[in-house]
């Protein structure tokens, strides 16, 4: 796609990342690291999921509460 000045429209040419999680789905994950705000960081098929009130090394069942383009939020269940 080109804009009205004959230049490529970068936004339309971006590669869309396949998001492997959906809001409301449940997973069993292991907390691999801790975020700056203290949330645990897990991954589902390499996709980052932030889980509050967890500790590094903990394995928990989670429910996805929000999905963004590069990460998701989940809660322990």
From Swiss-Prot:
Residues 20-77 form the TRAM domain. Residues 11-21 have a biased composition (Basic and acidic residues). InterPro entries: NA-bd_OB-fold, TRAM_dom. Gene3D superfamilies: Nucleic acid-binding proteins. Residues 1-10 have a biased composition (Basic residues). It comes from the Archaea. SUPFAM superfamilies: Nucleic acid-binding proteins. Residues 1-21 are annotated as: Disordered. This is Uncharacterized protein MJ0660.
């Amino acid at each position: 796609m080109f804009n009205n000045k004959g230049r490529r429209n970068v936004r339309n040419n971006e590669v869309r990342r396949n998001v492997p999680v959906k809001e409301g789905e449940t997973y069993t994950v292991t907390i691999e690291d801790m975020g700056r705000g203290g949330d645990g960081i897990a991954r589902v098929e390499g996709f980052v999921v932030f889980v509050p009130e967890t500790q590094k090394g903990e394995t928990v069942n989670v429910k996805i509460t929000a999905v963004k383009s590069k990460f998701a939020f989940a809660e322990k269940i």
